Amino acid sequence: MNTIVKHTVGFIASIVLTLLAVFVTLYTNMTFHAKVTIIFGFAFIQAALQLLMFMHLTEGKDGRLQSFKVIFAIIITLVTVIGTYWVMQGGHSSHL
């Protein structure tokens, strides 16, 4: 895909995802937790879109290796965040 076309598609998709998040927040009667879940979903999709369209993650001869590095970093981040939350909740509930 041409670079200009790729950047244009990525830009338009990012704007659409942002507007969808604004619409969900302002114009729906969903619960707070449902809104946050949907917005986080849009955020993760937009982050992946940014990596693929603008950061050229999969391009070049090391594209596949870069993809594995990003996936590994995401897994480490999730383990750290979820593990920290789990430990904090366990410590908080044992003190009550």
Swiss-Prot record:
<dbReference type="GO" id="GO:0042773">
    <property type="term" value="P:ATP synthesis coupled electron transport"/>
</dbReference>
<dbReference type="InterPro" id="IPR014250">
    <property type="entry name" value="QoxD"/>
</dbReference>
<keyword id="KW-0560">Oxidoreductase</keyword>
<feature type="transmembrane region" description="Helical">
    <location>
        <begin position="36"/>
        <end position="56"/>
    </location>
</feature>
<dbReference type="Pfam" id="PF03626">
    <property type="entry name" value="COX4_pro"/>
</dbReference>
<dbReference type="GO" id="GO:0009319">
    <property type="term" value="C:cytochrome o ubiquinol oxidase complex"/>
</dbReference>
<comment type="similarity">
    <text>Belongs to the cytochrome c oxidase bacterial subunit 4 family.</text>
</comment>
<dbReference type="GO" id="GO:0016682">
    <property type="term" value="F:oxidoreductase activity, acting on diphenols and related substances as donors, oxygen as acceptor"/>
</dbReference>
<keyword id="KW-1003">Cell membrane</keyword>
<dbReference type="GO" id="GO:0009486">
    <property type="term" value="F:cytochrome bo3 ubiquinol oxidase activity"/>
</dbReference>
<feature type="transmembrane region" description="Helical">
    <location>
        <begin position="68"/>
        <end position="88"/>
    </location>
</feature>
<feature type="transmembrane region" description="Helical">
    <location>
        <begin position="8"/>
        <end position="28"/>
    </location>
</feature>
<keyword id="KW-0472">Membrane</keyword>
<keyword id="KW-0812">Transmembrane</keyword>
<dbReference type="InterPro" id="IPR005171">
    <property type="entry name" value="Cyt_c_oxidase_su4_prok"/>
</dbReference>
<protein>
    <recommendedName>
        <fullName>Probable quinol oxidase subunit 4</fullName>
        <ecNumber>1.10.3.-</ecNumber>
    </recommendedName>
</protein>
<dbReference type="GO" id="GO:0015990">
    <property type="term" value="P:electron transport coupled proton transport"/>
</dbReference>
<dbReference type="InterPro" id="IPR050968">
    <property type="entry name" value="Cytochrome_c_oxidase_bac_sub4"/>
</dbReference>
<dbReference type="GO" id="GO:0005886">
    <property type="term" value="C:plasma membrane"/>
</dbReference>
<keyword id="KW-1133">Transmembrane helix</keyword>
<dbReference type="GO" id="GO:0019646">
    <property type="term" value="P:aerobic electron transport chain"/>
</dbReference>
<dbReference type="GO" id="GO:0015078">
    <property type="term" value="F:proton transmembrane transporter activity"/>
</dbReference>
<comment type="function">
    <text>Catalyzes quinol oxidation with the concomitant reduction of oxygen to water.</text>
</comment>
